[in-house]
C-alpha cells in the first residue's frame, strides 16, 4: 500500500510568496433602545440614562421624552458586546426596581 501525500505546488528556492492583504472593517454597531410603557416613571428613565449611558440631565430628559412620545428612543450606539451588556444591566435594574421598562438592541 502506497502512502500518497497531498500535492502542493513546488517552488524554486528563489520564489517569494506574497502575503494577501486582508481588508479590515470596523465592527458592526448596535443601537441600544428604551421602549415606552405606561408604568415606568419618567424620572426612573432619566436616572437610567444618566447612570448607564452617561447622559447629562438635559440630554437624558430629551431622550426620555422621545421614548414617551414616539414609543422608543436611542440611548447610544455601541459594539455588540457592549450593547448587550448595557441591555442586560438596564433590564436587571428595572426588574429589581419593580418597573417593566424594556431595553433592547438592534443593528444600526
Curated annotation (Swiss-Prot):
One GO BP annotation of this record: protein catabolic process
Function: Involved in the modulation of the specificity of the ClpAP-mediated ATP-dependent protein degradation.
Assembly and oligomerization: Binds to the N-terminal domain of the chaperone ClpA.
Family the UniProt entry places it in: Belongs to the ClpS family.
HAMAP family for this protein: ClpS (MF_00302)
Record protein name field: ATP-dependent Clp protease adapter protein ClpS
Gene name per UniProt: clpS
Amino acid at each position: 500500500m502506497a502512502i500518497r501525500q497531498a500535492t502542493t505546488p513546488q517552488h524554486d528556492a528563489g520564489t517569494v510568496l506574497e502575503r494577501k492583504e486582508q481588508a479590515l472593517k470596523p465592527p458592526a454597531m448596535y443601537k441600544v433602545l428604551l421602549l415606552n410603557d405606561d408604568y415606568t416613571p419618567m424620572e426612573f428613565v432619566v436616572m437610567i440614562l444618566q447612570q448607564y449611558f452617561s447622559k447629562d440631565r438635559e440630554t437624558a430628559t430629551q431622550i426620555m421624552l422621545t421614548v414617551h412620545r414616539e414609543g422608543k428612543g436611542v440611548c447610544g450606539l455601541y459594539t455588540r458586546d457592549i450593547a448587550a451588556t448595557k441591555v442586560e444591566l438596564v433590564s436587571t435594574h428595572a426588574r429589581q426596581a419593580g418597573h417593566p421598562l424594556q431595553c433592547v438592541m438592534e443593528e444600526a
